[in-house]
Curated annotation (Swiss-Prot):
Localization: Nucleus
Ranges of the DNA-binding region feature: 37-63
Function: Transcriptional regulator; part of the gene cluster that mediates the biosynthesis of the tetrahydroxanthone dimer neosartorin, which exhibits antibacterial activity.
Major subcellular location class: nucleus
Name of protein: Transcriptional regulator nsrM
Superkingdom of origin organism: Eukaryota
Organism per entry: Aspergillus novofumigatus (strain IBT 16806)
UniProt KW keywords: DNA-binding, Metal-binding, Nucleus, Transcription, Transcription regulation, Zinc
A GO biological-process term: DNA-templated transcription
Length: 708
């Protein structure tokens, strides 16, 4: 029985079989809708709905009954929203400002079911979305603590700026002047120093500025000449009324410009010695930096001044100390957001580009300092996303190429293994052409990409292009050598073949050859200050170690020639310093040549000492009067017995402690070839790159400061 409800609220009981019969009768009584045939629909005439219809019979055409067209499906809202989210993601990825569809909506974290032992499977971990953008603290606080109607819509940047302004207001108070921490690294300002008197004369200011534009700016590209030069011209007209940040930048330009000159050039251009000029301008730079609170910088000019100042003092500074100072500068840069690409949307194109150049210059300089002190603490890691500078205009070629090469290196497996293997999980292999890089040939792929994208279009007759070509190739060879070490140190059971040893030696020799080209070419005379900063110490270590172990190989003659040529090229511009490190270097060279000389004499072959050996014997003979190490006047070489004595003479001690640094201590990168160079990579006993205690005791960072 069914209850039927009528508007009159009368309830009638009707049998169920009566209801079913009535429904079936009504359904069958409906006649199907008749549609015109296809021909009549096309001609738009009335069809009699027969088969065939009269119109088709009259026109003698085939009558095709029409069928119901499929109903057009409604566009799914989910598909539309997914497509919209995809487009919004692309806009965010390219840092393009837009108004999102749901600005207040936040994706709730997905909580996956986990077992009781709190372990997650690799599949679940891979499916968990990873958030690339860090959560902003001020935005989170405002979301949680404010009601929606109380939120004034201020962005996190505005809120963070409010906090910075509060700190600035605090340190401006007289009672807070002793709590700012400005004296932590640069010390207290000297009251008896007249900074205005430390400025050079107007003519010399423009001469130093021109020197900076010719010697330094083409390589670093951290200042924008069209906008900075008018500011300097205006400042020179009234040195007593300069903004402290601009004044610090000017002093840092003085410092690095003088550092790029030779001593005779300083006398000719500035009428004073290089040492006196550096002491004067560095003092002025420090005083002005203290005045403008360097560790609280929020503008690029101040950070650029710190960077240029640190570069200018690097030749006379312990790399460990300089690395610590750079760590503070990098923290300032991170606070300013230079490492985060998403922060660049609030700046103009020129400002954003200059910030990128400054960040990459800081990172590359820091990496060089870490090579000479502690490789593992480098900032060249895949944990930040600042893009490389653009090669527009092409005058920034050197800075762009070294930035892109550093960007590729920081994602390679061998580099991450040396720095921190944990970062391999977040690293991604990439190259300029977005082609996948195999782990077995990372550096080979990178080298081909750099050669095809940049070096193939360089003009060797152009000084900047010449510098770019050979600096890049030398750096590529160095990293191929490091890749060789990482590959064999990570495989204890795998012994090196002769082909692999020869390949590694070829990388070291290429480093020497590239450095020699940069040293002897007149095209690089303006850039020699940077060439001095990158001594191929790793190449010397590898070549000398290989020659000691394999003195009978056919490549030995080429190796000795390459070392001699590089030695002579660097001796063209010697640096006065002590004899400690040179003495240790001399011992190693004489040991390697002693093994080679024994082989030649046993084979009855003529023994002709290379120039590097002759020069070292001469210098060691001058320091040890009456020693048998003095070369013979007739032949220019000592007897076989005298070589053995000289290699183990008391004049060349077997153990020397070189923990300190000379007055010019930038020099060689720290690592030798032993496992102690890379503590995170265990050196297997069977590895054929072992170094004895003598090699471990030597501090190779100081070697280039000697007069050799």
């Amino acid at each position: 029985m069914f209850l039927l409800h009528f508007p009159s609220a009368l309830i009638i009981l009707v049998p169920s079989h009566r209801i079913a019969f009535t429904m079936s009768t009504d359904h069958s009584a409906r006649s199907p809708r008749l549609r015109a045939c296809v021909r009549c629909q096309q001609r738009k005439v009335r069809c009699d709905h027969k088969s065939p219809c009269g119109n088709c019979v009259a026109s003698d055409s085939q009558c095709v009954p029409a069928t119901l067209t499929p109903r057009r499906r409604r566009f799914q809202e989910r598909v539309l929203l997914d497509r919209l989210r995809h487009y919004e993601g692309l806009l965010r990825q390219h840092n393009i400002y837009f108004e999102p569809l749901h600005p207040q909506a936040k994706q709730e974290p997905v909580i996956a079911d986990v077992p009781r032992d709190c372990e997650r499977s690799e599949t679940a971990r891979a499916q968990t979305p990873v958030q690339s953008q860090a959560v902003d603290l001020w935005q989170a606080i405002s979301r949680v603590t404010l009601e929606p109607e109380d939120d004034d819509g201020d962005s996190p940047d505005v809120q963070a700026d409010g906090v910075e302004n509060a700190w600035d207001h605090h340190v401006d108070q007289p009672e807070a002047n002793d709590q700012t921490g400005d004296d932590l690294l640069f010390g207290q300002p000297q009251a008896n120093v007249n900074v205005l008197a430390l400025h050079p004369e107007q003519a010399q200011i423009f001469r130093l500025w021109q020197t900076y534009l010719e010697n330094v700016n083409p390589l670093l590209k951290v200042t924008h000449t069209p906008t900075l030069q008018p500011r300097i011209v205006d400042a020179v007209s009234d040195l007593g009324d300069i903004h402290p940040t601009l004044e610090a930048l000017m002093f840092s330009i003085y410092c690095i410009a003088v550092m790029s000159l030779a001593d005779n050039e300083c006398h000719r251009l500035l009428k004073s010695s290089k040492e006196d000029l550096l002491a004067r301008y560095r003092l002025g730079c420090r005083q002005v930096l203290i005045k403008c609170r360097p560790w609280q910088f929020t503008n690029v000019d101040g950070l650029t001044a710190v960077y240029l100042y640190l570069v200018s003092v690097s030749p006379q500074t312990d790399p460990r100390s300089l690395s610590s100072m750079l760590a503070a500068a990098l923290r300032i840069a991170q606070r300013m957001g230079l490492h985060n690409e998403s922060t660049y949307t609030r700046y103009t194109a020129v400002e954003a580009e200059m910030r990128r150049r400054l960040w990459w210059s800081l990172v590359i300089f820091d990496h060089r300092m870490c090579e000479m002190s502690d490789y593992k603490v480098t900032t060249l890691t895949p944990t930040w996303d600042c893009r490389i500078p653009l090669n527009k205009p092409t005058e920034a070629l050197f800075a762009v190429v070294r930035s892109e090469l550093a960007d590729l290196i920081r994602h390679t497996t061998f580099h991450i293994n040396f720095v921190n293997p944990v970062l391999a999980a977040v690293a991604k292999a990439k190259d300029p052409g977005h082609v996948s890089i195999s782990a077995d040939g990372e550096m080979l792929t990178i080298q081909r990409a750099i050669e095809e994208k940049y070096l193939a279009f360089c003009d060797p007759a152009d000084p900047l292009h010449f510098m770019t070509i050979w600096t890049t190739r030398g750096y590529l060879a160095r990293n191929r050598l490091l890749e060789h070490y990482a590959r064999h140190l990570s495989s204890p059971a795998m012994q090196q073949t002769d082909a692999q040893r020869n390949a590694a030696l070829s990388y070291a020799l290429e480093m020497l050859e590239c450095d020699t080209r940069l040293r002897v070419s007149p095209l690089t005379c303006r850039y020699r200050w940077l060439v001095d900063f990158h001594v191929p110490a790793l190449a010397y270590i590898h070549v000398l170690n290989d020659l000691r172990k394999r003195p009978t190989e056919s490549h030995a003659g080429k190796a000795w020639q390459a070392m001699s040529e590089n030695y002579e090229a660097r001796a063209m511009h010697p640096k006065p310093s002590g004899q400690g490190v040179f003495t240790v270097f001399a011992r190693v060279v004489l040991q390697a040549w002693g093994a080679r000389e024994i082989f030649l004499r046993q084979r009855g072959m003529p023994v002709e000492a290379p120039q590097i050996v002759l020069d070292i014997r001469s210098k060691v003979g001058q320091t040890s009067s009456g020693s048998s190490m003095v070369p013979s006047c007739s032949t220019g070489e000592p007897s076989h017995s005298s070589i053995a004595i000289s290699a183990h003479s008391e004049a060349i001690p077997a153990q020397m402690n070189f923990t300190g640094h000379s007055a010019d201590g930038q020099a060689f990168p720290g690592p030798d070839l032993g496992p102690s160079s890379f503590p995170d990579v265990a050196g297997p006993p069977g590895m054929d790159i072992d170094i004895d205690q003598f090699w471990t005791a030597m501090d190779w960072r100081l070697m280039h400061t000697q007069a050799w």
